[in-house]
Regions:
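Conserved NAD+-utilizing ADP-ribose enzyme module
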Residues: 23-24, 44-156
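A broad, structure-centric signal for solvent-exposed, well-ordered loop/edge residues
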Residues: 11-13, 38, 66
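Extended catalytic/binding region for NAD+/ADP-ribose chemistry, centered on the ART fold
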Residues: 20-44
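Short, conserved beta-strand segments within well-ordered enzyme catalytic domains
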Residues: 3-5, 30-31, 56-58
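Terminal, compositionally biased segments used for targeting/anchoring and flexible tails
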Residues: 9-11, 40-43, 59
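Short aromatic-glycine-(Arg/Gly/Cys) micro-motifs in beta-strand/loop hairpins
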Residues: 1-23
């Protein structure tokens, strides 16, 4: 499977050292199988006057069974709870790989309203169920990263 990472620089050797904490699926290296999603991720760097660079990887899916994986097929109560724990620094899970929806602008607004206590969980789930998830994959361990092989990059 081909996966993409959007940044301001080429990342030939992904690592966990440079990852941020308190994001959707916790500390890790984020990729997507959707080229258009990687282009969107580059947008924030381009708006700051930096280059947008998409790095491309081959992911060895045949070995995914070796990883402890959490998959969210939709925006759900479980997804929302997991995002809340990760973004608030309370995630204590040991997943190698987490797969699920991206909190895009509309989804992010709903999540923020919930985090801020302005809507309850039921209302947040009701709003999210109509959204089609964009897919992100978070490689959270070195074991998971070992299945990701750099193939090249392109400047936008």
């Amino acid at each position: 499977m081909i996966l993409y990472h959007g940044s301001f620089l080429e990342i030939a050797k992904p690592d966990l050292v440079h990852s941020r904490s308190n994001v959707d699926f916790g500390r890790g290296f984020y990729v997507t199988p959707l080229y258009e999603q990687a282009v969107k991720w580059c947008g924030k760097f381009k708006r700051r006057g930096k280059d947008g660079i998409i790095s491309r990887y081959e992911y060895d899916e045949s070995r995914e069974s070796e990883l402890k994986t959490l998959k969210f097929d939709s925006y759900s109560e479980e997804w929302l709870d997991f995002i809340l724990n990760c973004r608030s620094g309370k995630d204590s899970t040991d997943y190698d790989l987490v797969v699920g929806g991206v909190a895009n602008d509309k989804v992010f607004n709903t999540v923020e309203l919930f985090f801020d206590g302005l809507i309850d969980k039921a209302e947040a789930i009701n709003r999210l169920r109509y959204e089609k998830p964009n897919l992100q994959i978070c490689f959270r361990t070195e074991k998971a990263l070992s299945l990701l092989h750099f193939e090249g990059s392109e400047r936008l």
